[in-house]
Amino acid sequence: MVLPASMRLRGHRCFSRLHRSQRRHHGKWMVLRQIKRDRTLLRSELRSQHDTTCRCALVISNKVSKRAVRRNRLRRLLHNHLRQRLEQRTDLAGTWLLFSLRPDAAEAEPAQLLEECDSLLKIAGLER
């Protein structure tokens, strides 16, 4: 299942800011970048909305897999996991997260990816 719209991070400026972020946490198969919310980067209709959860995005490039089916399976797996982990966490409101999968992530078992996702959240101080 995909992330609900209230949890999705969208827009070129948001992604650019996250890529320049100094708060990066590296794992074997993915990188987590995080920043505090900056409403000026959001589209005008989203600026007035109150964030009740954190917003996150997932980047899975063609380097991970040339097959869209494989990339979409990874995306669905991680979206579902993040939704379950972060949906009820109101204490994280105002945090933006960007997960970028590394090229060799397609070779990892799904359980390994989910475990690494949890460990990166813990390292970032976002997991209880």
Swiss-Prot record:
Pfam families: Ribonuclease_P (PF00825)
Keywords attached to this entry: Endonuclease, Hydrolase, Nuclease, RNA-binding, tRNA processing
GO cellular component, one term: ribonuclease P complex
Signal peptide start and end residues: none
EC annotation from Swiss-Prot or TrEMBL: 3.1.26.5
Keyword RNA-binding (UniProt): yes
Catalysed transformations (reactions): Endonucleolytic cleavage of RNA, removing 5'-extranucleotides from tRNA precursor
InterPro entries cross-referenced by the UniProt entry: Ribosomal_Su5_D2-typ_SF (IPR020568), Ribsml_uS5_D2-typ_fold_subgr (IPR014721), RNase_P (IPR000100)
GO molecular function, one term: 3'-tRNA processing endoribonuclease activity
GO BP: tRNA 5'-leader removal
Subunit structure of this chain's protein: Consists of a catalytic RNA component (M1 or rnpB) and a protein subunit.
Family to which the UniProt record says this protein belongs: Belongs to the RnpA family.
Function: RNaseP catalyzes the removal of the 5'-leader sequence from pre-tRNA to produce the mature 5'-terminus. It can also cleave other RNA substrates such as 4.5S RNA. The protein component plays an auxiliary but essential role in vivo by binding to the 5'-leader sequence and broadening the substrate specificity of the ribozyme.
UniProt protein name: Ribonuclease P protein component
Organism this protein belongs to: Synechococcus sp. (strain CC9902)
